[in-house]
């Protein structure tokens, strides 16, 4: 079994040297991701495609490979194929017939052929010969070239024949790390998750900067979003998660700054702090989830004033998107449920926020801050490799005395906290045990209604979400919660 990875068309349009560099990077990225599934994954680069071979004795890897290939930037689509050899057009037909005889019963069909290499026949000749043979020797209704019930896709590569089993759409975009690094200001909401994804897709290694306004619970929620984005779409590369304690900044703004200027000044302080971090780690640009007119600080005038506080490039990929379009995109990339579960933390709320800030007034207000305020908070920032979030959760759970168990006692109840789509795709089966389903984004509100005399075991497939949720509940004072890792 093989996967043929087709490059995104924009890569194919590049010059020979750039195309070669992008293809090499994509090959490396695919190998880095798939080796986390199977150390023996075979990845081979060709000029216009990348071949991935699934070990013959490991058919269970097919779906896992397909899922991950569909989430790697730079891929237009992937076709899963069975590989054969042939010595004539009739030989091709003889191999196709037994595979499709039953599937064609009562259906219209057509045959499509893509061909690479020198042959004594044309692609259309193969289509006609194979299609005519199938039409005569099966119970098919007939050939239909437009909108058939079944399309038989064949690829001929020199002396090899590939029969397409299925097609997986890719992300598109450019391979990770073909563009320079960016630092995404992430809050855990709909906007910052989608804006981060846009730059991952565009091939920029995306690091995360979180300004903590809402305490440890807020940080736990934001880490869930960042970890999901990295694990799903950017796992081929290491990235940083930076948490900056911002409570002191909020306090000074509330105590010292004119009410109407608070929102713009808060954003300027964030940009200055993020700029210092970006300079420290050699990052080329900041990314925000701002959208024009969505809130008072996001008018053109205010965005211009915010930009004046730094020489670093500030990128706003969502600037012209409607809120519903952003939410729809978050649903596609899997961050919608996370965003729903994170409250809006507005540490700075102006009663009459300005929509036309004046730079001179803003700068005069900023003189009221304590000396070296921004430098001091940046010095307190915590920087971790994002892959270590799972390890960090283990340590925090141990410190909080929350157990991780591998078996379920009869008196314990398992709560499957996966999103509905994941739970339906791969249901948790524990014969003789009680299993409840509460999606993680509803757990914080529904857990209080559960029987406090019962011990609940939180379950998710990777174990990260269950640990994060257990930490959150323990911090809320619950002691009847554990993590279930079978």
Curated annotation (Swiss-Prot):
Residues at the catalytic site: 460 (cysteine persulfide intermediate)
Residues annotated as domain Rhodanese: 408-486
MF term (GO), any: tRNA binding
GO biological process: thiamine biosynthetic process; thiamine diphosphate biosynthetic process; thiazole biosynthetic process; tRNA 4-thiouridine biosynthesis
Reaction catalyzed: [ThiI sulfur-carrier protein]-S-sulfanyl-L-cysteine + a uridine in tRNA + 2 reduced [2Fe-2S]-[ferredoxin] + ATP + H(+) = [ThiI sulfur-carrier protein]-L-cysteine + a 4-thiouridine in tRNA + 2 oxidized [2Fe-2S]-[ferredoxin] + AMP + diphosphate; [ThiS sulfur-carrier protein]-C-terminal Gly-Gly-AMP + S-sulfanyl-L-cysteinyl-[cysteine desulfurase] + AH2 = [ThiS sulfur-carrier protein]-C-terminal-Gly-aminoethanethioate + L-cysteinyl-[cysteine desulfurase] + A + AMP + 2 H(+)
Leading EC class: transferase
Broad class of where this protein is predominantly found: cytoplasm
Domain THUMP: 63-167
Classification via Gene3D superfamilies: 3.30.2130.30, HUPs, Rhodanese-like domain
Localization (cell): Cytoplasm
Family matches, as CDD domains: PPase_ThiI, RHOD, THUMP_ThiI
Protein residues bound to ATP: 185-186, 267, 289, 298
InterPro entries registered for this protein in UniProt: Rhodanese-like_dom, Rhodanese-like_dom_sf, Rossmann-like_a/b/a_fold, ThiI_AANH, ThiI_fer, ThiI_N, THII_Thiazole_biosynth_dom, THUMP_dom
SUPFAM superfamilies in alphabetical order: Adenine nucleotide alpha hydrolases-like, Rhodanese/Cell cycle control phosphatase, THUMP domain-like
Cysteine pairings via disulfide bonds: 346-460
EC number: 2.8.1.4
Pathway: Cofactor biosynthesis; thiamine diphosphate biosynthesis
Keyword Transferase among UniProt keywords: yes
Record's keyword terms, sorted: ATP-binding, Cytoplasm, Disulfide bond, Nucleotide-binding, Redox-active center, RNA-binding, Thiamine biosynthesis, Transferase, tRNA-binding
Record-level GO cellular component terms: cytosol
NCBIfam families for the chain: ThiI_C_thiazole, tRNA uracil 4-sulfurtransferase ThiI
Entry's family note: Belongs to the ThiI family.
Function of the molecule: Catalyzes the ATP-dependent transfer of a sulfur to tRNA to produce 4-thiouridine in position 8 of tRNAs, which functions as a near-UV photosensor. Also catalyzes the transfer of sulfur to the sulfur carrier protein ThiS, forming ThiS-thiocarboxylate. This is a step in the synthesis of thiazole, in the thiamine biosynthesis pathway. The sulfur is donated as persulfide by IscS.
Protein name, entry field: tRNA sulfurtransferase
Originating organism: Shewanella denitrificans (strain OS217 / ATCC BAA-1090 / DSM 15013)
């Amino acid at each position: 079994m093989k996967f043929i990875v087709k490059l995104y068309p924009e890569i194919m349009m590049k010059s020979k040297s750039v195309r070669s560099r992008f293809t090499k990077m994509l090959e490396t990225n695919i190998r880095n991701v798939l080796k986390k599934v199977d150390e023996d994954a075979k990845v081979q680069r060709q000029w216009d495609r990348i071949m991935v071979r699934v070990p013959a004795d490991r058919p269970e890897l097919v779906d896992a490979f397909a899922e991950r290939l569909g989430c790697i930037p730079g891929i237009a689509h992937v076709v899963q194929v069975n590989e054969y050899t042939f010595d004539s057009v009739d030989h091709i037909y003889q191999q196709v017939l037994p595979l499709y005889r039953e599937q064609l019963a009562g259906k219209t069909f057509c045959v499509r052929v893509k061909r690479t290499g020198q042959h004594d026949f044309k692609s259309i000749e193969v289509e006609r010969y194979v299609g005519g043979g199938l039409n005569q020797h099966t119970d098919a209704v007939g050939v239909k070239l437009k909108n058939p019930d079944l399309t038989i896709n064949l690829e001929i590569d020199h002396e090899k024949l590939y029969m397409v089993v299925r097609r997986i759409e890719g992300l598109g975009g450019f391979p990770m790390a073909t563009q320079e690094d960016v630092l995404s200001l992430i809050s855990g909401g709909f906007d910052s998750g989608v804006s981060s994804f846009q730059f991952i897709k565009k091939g920029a290694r995306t690091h995360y900067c979180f300004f903590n306004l809402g305490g440890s619970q807020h940080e736990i929620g934001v880490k869930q979003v960042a970890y999901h984005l990295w694990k799903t779409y950017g796992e081929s590369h290491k990235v940083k998660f930076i948490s900056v304690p911002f409570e002191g900044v909020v306090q000074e703004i509330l105590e010292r700054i004119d009410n109407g200027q608070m929102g713009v000044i808060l954003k300027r302080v964030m940009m200055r702090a993020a700029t210092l971090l970006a300079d420290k780690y050699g990052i080329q640009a900041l990314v925000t989830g701002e959208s024009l007119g969505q809130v008072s600080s996001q008018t053109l005038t205010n965005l211009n004033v915010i930009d004046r506080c730094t020489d670093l490039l500030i990128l706003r990929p969502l600037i012209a998107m409607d809120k519903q379009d952003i939410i729809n995109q978050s649903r596609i990339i899997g961050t919608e449920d996370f965003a729903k579960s994170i409250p809006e933390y507005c540490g700075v709320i102006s009663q009459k926020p300005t929509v036309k800030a004046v730079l001179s007034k803003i700068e005069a207000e900023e003189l009221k801050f304590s000396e070296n305020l921004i430098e001091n908070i940046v010095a307190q920032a915590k920087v971790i490799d994002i892959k270590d979030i799972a390890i960090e959760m283990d340590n925090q759970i141990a410190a909080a005395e929350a157990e991780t168990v591998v078996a379920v006692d009869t008196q314990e109840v398992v709560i499957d906290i996966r999103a509905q789509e994941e739970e339906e795709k791969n249901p948790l089966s524990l014969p003789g045990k009680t299993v409840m389903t509460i999606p993680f984004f509803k757990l914080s509100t529904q857990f209080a209604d559960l029987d406090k005399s019962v011990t609940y075991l939180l379950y998710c497939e990777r174990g990260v979400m269950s640990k994060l949720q257990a930490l959150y509940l323990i911090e809320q004072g619950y002691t009847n919660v554990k993590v279930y890792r079978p």
